């Protein structure tokens, strides 16, 4: 129990937060800066933008921001060669309730039922 408390105390003292992002290789990733006056620590080209955002080219990379309050935000980008949703065809094969075929069949069943009920009552 004391070991768990000690490890928790060490983790809180370092104040290191981790952020993970998946992206398609070669695209640009838009991320929000964790703190406005942070120091960038990394080897990837970093492009600061308005509203405390920044852009990075997607590649498998590891970088960090060190904030003035001592908090360190570590980012891990994981690049994929192809997006899995890029080439998937969205074919939803389902039949609507009010399709013409359904309406024709329903009308025929209704007419047949009307005639059979009428014959039974005679």
Swiss-Prot record:
Keywords: Disulfide bond, G0/G1 host cell cycle checkpoint dysregulation by virus, Host endoplasmic reticulum, Host Golgi apparatus, Host membrane, Host-virus interaction, Membrane, Modulation of host cell cycle by virus, Signal, Transmembrane, Transmembrane helix, Virion. It is a single-pass membrane protein; Single-pass type I membrane protein. The keyword Cytoplasm does not apply. Residues 118-122 are intravirion. Its main location: virion. Pfam families: bCoV_NS7A. Residues 16-81 form the X4e domain. Gene3D superfamilies: SARS coronavirus X4 (2.60.40.1550). One of its GO terms (cellular component) is membrane. The chain crosses the membrane at residues 97-117. A motif (Di-lysine motif) lies at residues 118-122. Disulfide bonds join 23-58, 35-67. The di-lysine motif confers endoplasmic reticulum localization for type I membrane proteins. Interacts with the spike glycoprotein, M protein, E protein and the accessory protein 3. Bat coronavirus HKU3 is highly similar to SARS-CoV (SARS-like). This is Protein 7a. It comes from Bat coronavirus HKU3 (BtCoV). The lineage of its organism: Viruses, Riboviria, Orthornavirae, Pisuviricota, Pisoniviricetes.
């Amino acid at each position: 129990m004391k070991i768990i408390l000690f490890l928790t105390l060490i983790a809180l003292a370092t104040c290191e937060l981790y952020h993970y992002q998946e992206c398609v290789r070669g695209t640009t990733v838009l991320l929000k800066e964790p703190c406005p006056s942070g120091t960038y620590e990394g080897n990837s080209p970093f492009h600061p933008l308005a509203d405390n955002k920044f852009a990075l080219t997607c590649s498998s990379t590891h970088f960090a921001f060190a904030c003035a309050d001592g908090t360190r935000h570590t980012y891990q980008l994981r690049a994929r060669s192809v997006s899995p949703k890029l080439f998937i065809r969205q074919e939803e094969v389902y039949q609507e309730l009010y399709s013409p075929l359904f309406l024709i069949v329903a009308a025929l069943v209704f007419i047949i039922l009307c005639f059979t009920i009428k014959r039974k009552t005679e």
